[in-house]
């Protein structure tokens, strides 16, 4: 079935892009979409507690956003900007580099105040090895900036270090926020536990490819970027138990969806550690996930394709049109949907 990327386009008024977070995490709005009937209803995010039951399992991604934007220069003084993509070891890392002229393999360049050597280049990705005493973790800690997405059109500010991070973030490695999780305050997490709803954590480190628009006309010929995930054995046990007892597996965010569906590709959820480049678009089957919380996604993105696979493209486009008419806030710092 030929599916055009343009079929996942929609017109969004620019003023609905949320460049700043609300004062309180859980003060956002929640659009509830029944994927069977297409019924849409408007709620506050704190109402989510009423949509879940004891016996349900919520699966969160506990990846932590790195202070991945760094600056530096060539030995000539020419300015460089880095977006750290993946850390191999404390002195060795993959990074994007923004420069007037690309640094050559074998050359030495500065990452902030520390010298590094360009070991390799693959497409737009460089492999750097730090020559000085500091490691990449120290450099990020001392100089790093939160890598806000380009559509926010602003530099990061002090509050972003906290607000572009979930309250349960633990495992450092993402270059973008786990946006569905940003709505969960510590109070709401406590209410969920008090209600007898079970919680589990997987890890998927979001790469910068998450911002990459689909550039081919035919959806199926798009090549997904690979990201590192971990779905531990105890999470698989909880999922099997939940299903056996008639509860629902509810994922918080598309990263949790992609992780669980990778681990459940053979129809049975199994522990998984490694890379995934799973691409979920209409026609693909979901073996694990019963419901999800997710933000509103960019036009023509792989993420709007994922939610369209879960709930049917026409229903998603209708829900987005409703959200625009009702002045919902879009993207990373925006409002959320509950699709069930």
UniProtKB/Swiss-Prot annotation:
Pathway: tRNA modification; tRNA-queuosine biosynthesis
A GO biological process held by the record: queuosine biosynthetic process
Catalytic activity: 7-aminomethyl-7-carbaguanosine(34) in tRNA + S-adenosyl-L-methionine = epoxyqueuosine(34) in tRNA + adenine + L-methionine + 2 H(+)
Subcellular location: Cytoplasm
Enzyme class: transferase
Domain of life: Bacteria
Annotated InterPro entries: QueA (IPR003699), QueA_dom1 (IPR042118), QueA_dom2 (IPR042119), QueA_sf (IPR036100)
GO cellular component terms attached to this protein's record: cytoplasm
GO MF annotations in UniProt: S-adenosylmethionine:tRNA ribosyltransferase-isomerase activity
Main location class: cytoplasm
Enzyme Commission designation: 2.4.99.17
Keywords: Cytoplasm, Queuosine biosynthesis, S-adenosyl-L-methionine, Transferase
Gene3D superfamilies named in the record: QueA-like (3.40.1780.10)
Transmembrane region(s): none
HAMAP family from the UniProt entry: QueA
Binding partners and assembly: Monomer.
Family under the similarity heading: Belongs to the QueA family.
NCBIfam families: PRK00147.1 (NF001140), queA (TIGR00113)
The protein's role, per its UniProt record: Transfers and isomerizes the ribose moiety from AdoMet to the 7-aminomethyl group of 7-deazaguanine (preQ1-tRNA) to give epoxyqueuosine (oQ-tRNA).
Protein name: S-adenosylmethionine:tRNA ribosyltransferase-isomerase
Native species: Francisella tularensis subsp. holarctica (strain OSU18)
